Amino acid sequence: MLKPLENRVVLRVKEEEEKSMGGIVLTSASQEKPQTAEVIAVGEGKTTNHGTLISPLVKVGDTVIFEKFAGTTVKMDGEEFLILKDSDLLAIVE
């Protein structure tokens, strides 16, 4: 499993529906990149210049919305994950 460093989080991106609302099957080129994901792992946080540790606000299991082109995609054990900084997260879905 991946263990993110500092203020990074590991996400499992949720696949979007491959059909339009009208039932038309979309090609991968016409689909927008998904922006919703499940948090799989969370780093310990980032240390400020004054030595204070600032922990990420998300926890494992949270569903989040992230910036459209954020992060780095990594494949591990046949599965694809996205690693990004917690500042690239926009919201927690409740």
UniProtKB/Swiss-Prot annotation:
SMART domains: Cpn10. GO terms for biological process: chaperone cofactor-dependent protein refolding. GO terms for cellular component: cytoplasm. This is Co-chaperonin GroES. InterPro entries: Chaperonin_GroES, Chaperonin_GroES_sf, Chaprnonin_Cpn10_CS, GroES-like_sf. One of its GO terms (molecular function) is protein folding chaperone. It comes from Lactococcus lactis subsp. cremoris (strain MG1363). Together with the chaperonin GroEL, plays an essential role in assisting protein folding. The GroEL-GroES system forms a nano-cage that allows encapsulation of the non-native substrate proteins and provides a physical environment optimized to promote and accelerate protein folding. GroES binds to the apical surface of the GroEL ring, thereby capping the opening of the GroEL channel. It is found in: Cytoplasm. SUPFAM superfamilies: GroES-like. Keywords: Chaperone, Cytoplasm.
